[in-house]
Regions:
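Short helix/strand-bridging catalytic loops that position acidic/His residues to coordinate divalent metals
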Residues: 124-130, 252-255, 410-417
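Signature of N6-adenine DNA methyltransferases within the class I
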Residues: 2-6, 226, 233, 237, ...
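Flexible, glycine/threonine-enriched loop-and-boundary segments that flank and lead into catalytic domains
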Residues: 178-213, 361-393, 409-417, 425
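Class I S-adenosyl-L-methionine-dependent methyltransferase module
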Residues: 208-215, 224-387, 391
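Short, hydrophobic/amphipathic alpha-helical patches that form generic packing surfaces
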Residues: 1-2, 99-106, 270-277, 377
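Extended, well-ordered alpha-helical scaffold/bundle regions in very large, multi-domain proteins
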Residues: 2-46, 228
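Catalytic palm active-site di-aspartate
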Residues: 220, 252-255, 443-444
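Class I S-adenosyl-L-methionine
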Residues: 6-11, 15, 55-250, 264, ...
Length: 511
């Protein structure tokens, strides 16, 4: 009652860094398949840590004790993943791990909501399990195509481009099946759109569209980022780039992501890296690392002034103090934290160089060694949170005010008074503040109807433009509370005619 993974039958032919072939032969000759499988998986993970450090950490001896037994038995999790999920579902479908992770958390989620009924608030440790919902593929495509895709199509449509360049619009639309064309606009609106787009990307100073930035501030396992990668690739290939060069630039310059869940962020990192590998067979050898991060806290770092003396410039010492202050209990708040714009990249450079200054001070060496990685993470997440992006697209966490911890409740009341009743609307307000062109989101439609959101609605209409909306009603997340998904343009265009679809008026199926 056992199955035999391919890695076992090919064990003696494997070439892995750190693989002890004598041990392989000994385990194989002794018919110790379980131990051999365990050894090969651990060795493979350690080898992968060199090229995928954000996903695979080196497994130490004590960690090996936690490795589960009996993985080769019929009915084990490994056997079920192989037997129950068709092989074709794994091919070019790296986002499948997001589905698996959501269901991995489902038991914990049930426990959290059972406790909530007893008035036990959701702690920061349980926020990921309680609030994560995997986004259906068609909604991901709708959001990305109508935000990131619209950045390109609107510019080609309204700026001064040759007829040859404008033919790319139809090429993109053939690929982007969920892209919704603009409604017919008045001459006055079209004139305003032309003025907005004129020389935005086609001035000749920068190659069009390649500096477009895209962030998912609640990225989960990276489903939205993975499809944004594909859309960016369509854009680059249309510009004449090779897929190899485009993959590297997309990861380095275009895609960004944040989440409070460490493990989900690892999966997002893995998904983006595997997407790069899909387009470039040598991608792992190029030393490129994506800008996707799990929000970290500063709680464990005790900072005394003398520890900061090796940062020679006062601005960097002040930035260190600020980082430790603003990210205290950061996993309680995640991407809704409002972070000052500072020279965080300059601070990072100074922080990396400061290691030499600690060599003559034993106390400082110990402190710096313990704080180094965390402070680096704090600076990177501060950099991402302090920027604006052409496109922000996300499926935010869902948690009503009644489930919030006292700290989180006080925070949103202070910083987000117009949207404080639910985390999804708080994230909506934050996302609009982060974008310069378009914001795409799926959330619950309470903000569309309840009187408590009247101020938000007035602000949205006065300062932004609704491009389009798809209102599916119930059923997107199973037996749920209803959803709406939409794209908002930054800045108000008076008289703009949006496009709206109600999918709940009759039973429909979206492919």
């Amino acid at each position: 009652n056992a199955f035999k993974p391919q890695i076992l039958s090919e064990a003696i032919n494997l070439e892995l860094d750190g693989l002890d072939m004598e041990k392989v032969y000994a385990l194989k000759n002794g018919n110790q398949d379980d131990e051999l499988f365990k050894y090969l998986v651990i060795t493979q993970c350690n080898a992968l840590s060199a090229i995928l450090p954000g996903m695979f950490q080196k497994i130490e001896d004590f960690t090996e004790l936690l490795f589960p037994d009996n993985l080769l038995r019929d009915g084990s999790v490994v056997e079920q993943m192989v037997a129950l999920i068709p092989e074709e579902d794994w091919k070019d479908q790296v986002q499948i791990i997001g589905w698996l992770y959501q269901y991995y958390n489902s038991e914990k989620k049930d426990d959290v909501f059972a406790a909530l009924k007893k008035n036990v608030k959701i702690t920061k440790e349980n926020i990921p399990a309680a609030t994560q919902l995997f986004t259906p593929d068609w909604i991901v495509r709708y959001m990305v195509e109508n935000s990131l895709g619209r950045v390109v199509i609107n510019n080609l449509k309204y700026d001064v481009w040759s007829d040859e360049e404008k033919t790319k619009i139809e090429q993109f639309k053939e690929k982007w099946k969920y892209y919704i064309d603009d409604a017919e606009q008045t001459p006055e609106v079209e004139a305003e759109l032309r003025a907005m787009e004129h020389n935005k990307y086609g001035s000749g100073e920068v190659e069009p569209f390649i500096d477009t930035t895209f962030i998912d501030p609640c990225m989960g396992s990276g489903h939205i980022l993975v499809y944004a990668f594909d859309v960016f690739m369509d854009i680059y290939l249309a510009q004449g780039w090779s897929s190899r060069d485009a993959a590297q630039r997309i990861v380095e310059k275009n895609l960004y992501g944040l989440d409070i869940d460490d493990r989900a962020a690892q999966l997002a990192y893995f998904s983006v890296m595997m997407k790069g590998r899909q387009y470039d067979g040598r991608f792992f050898k190029r030393g490129v690392q994506p800008h996707v991060y799990a929000i970290q806290e500063s709680n464990e770092i005790r900072y005394d002034e003398e520890f900061g003396e090796f940062l020679l410039e006062e601005q960097h010492r002040d930035t260190l103090r600020y980082l430790l202050e603003v990210f205290r209990d950061a996993k309680e708040y995640g991407s809704i934290l409002k972070v000052e714009p500072r020279d965080y990249l300059g601070f990072l450079n100074a922080w990396e160089l400061s290691a030499e200054a600690t060599l003559e001070n034993v106390m400082m060496i110990g402190w710096y060694t313990g704080a180094k990685d965390t402070v680096t993470a704090l600076a990177w997440q501060a950099h991402l949170l302090s920027q604006t992006y052409n496109v922000v697209a996300t499926n935010p966490p869902y948690m009503g005010a009644s489930g919030m911890s006292p700290k989180l409740s006080d925070f949103v009341k202070m910083d987000y008074p117009a949207t404080k009743s639910d985390m999804s609307t708080v994230c909506m307000e934050q996302a609009i503040g982060m974008c310069s062109d378009y914001m795409a989101m799926i959330n619950i439609p309470v903000w569309m109807f309840l009187s408590s959101y009247e101020k938000l609605r007035k602000n949205l209409i006065a300062n932004n433009t609704f491009i389009n909306m798809v209102h599916p009603g119930r059923g997107i997340f199973g037996s749920d509370f209803g959803t709406t998904t939409f794209v908002i343009g930054k800045g108000h265009i008076s008289g703009y005619q949006g496009t709206y679809h109600r999918l709940f008026e009759k039973q429909v199926e979206v492919e």
